[in-house]
Amino acid sequence: MQIGVFSVSDITRDPVTGRMPTEGERIKAAVAIARKVEEIGMDVYATGEHHNPPFYASSPTTLLGYIAAQTERIILSTATTLITTNDPVKIAEDFAMLQHLSGGRTDLVLGRGNTAPVYPWFGKNPQDSVDLTVENYNLLRQLWDNETVNWQGKFRTPLQNFTSTPRPLDGVAPFVWHGSIRTPQVAEIAAYFGDGFFANNIFWPKEHYMQLIGLYRERYEHYGHGSADQAIVGLGGQFFMRKNSQDAVNEFRPYFDNAPVYGHGPSMEDFTAQTPLTVGSPQEVLEKTLTFQEYFGDYQRQLFLIDHAGLPLKTVLEQLDLFGEYVLPELRRELDSRRPAHVPDGPTHARRAAAREASVSASAPVTSVG
């Protein structure tokens, strides 16, 4: 099980102190959080992509490239890379470059995003969202899988004898997850290509994500990539903890009540009852997270949102220390012990490169001697 954190990169006023962090402070905080993720033994750090205030992560690969130089072990990923408005050529180049810089510690989550105005900012029409997703991903796959690409589509200029550089590290493209909150077509694309499917699992009841993940698993098996329970699934989650449950509730309440997404809506008690959010003790965080496997089946990656809603960096780092000491070892042990032997581990570059090498060796012609 790969366990880590993801950020939506919001810049939000701290409702307790009234202080608004600067862009620079939030960017440096992201680096500090990623380093803490590695320090406590987590496996993944992922950042979102936004091109409007109040967010800072307009250039995820730049941020992740810097973090790669500050870390040695963790996988560096995105919470969303906008497949609809980014040029597939630039995605292919940027993430292959990040692969080389990080020594293969790179994958990405592709998604459509949730900000409609971003489409015209990049010369696209939001009504073409799904068609852009399909066409752009087909081109991205060709750019990574083929040395020379000749291609013509609807939404960008044709390519003739084009080679994307640098080439993927060891001939293995970065692993792709497809992220979706509500779009069945995205689950279909992930299943068709045998890619991973990442369910945000933050703001909706479990029944909503059970439908999307169930569809993805069914179609993954339909396309012949393996049994439904072998499909590669990632989940989000969200927590705030203190050693004493009531202390966590009291401390987090003003942040919850004023959060840009769910603030001034349902009560914190209702929201924690209806969604994956856990506010309480480390044991409560552990117990609720373990229920995800019961609802969604065996899965490979669990990421948590912990740095949003104006929470100060000091508090976020304390959350990670608590998680690393009281939750992570037991969570990893329990989830790994539940996973059947035929269900794969989370994807890594090393495993995928080894599988490719074995496949090439197996298909090589045998020459007789003598």
What are these regions (language model features)?
Residues 1-21, 115-118, 157-172, 264-274, ...:
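N-terminal small/glycine-rich loop or linker at the start of catalytic domains
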Residues 44-67, 82, 114, 201-204, ...:
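Glycine-rich, proline-tolerant flexible connector loops at the mouths of alpha/beta enzymes
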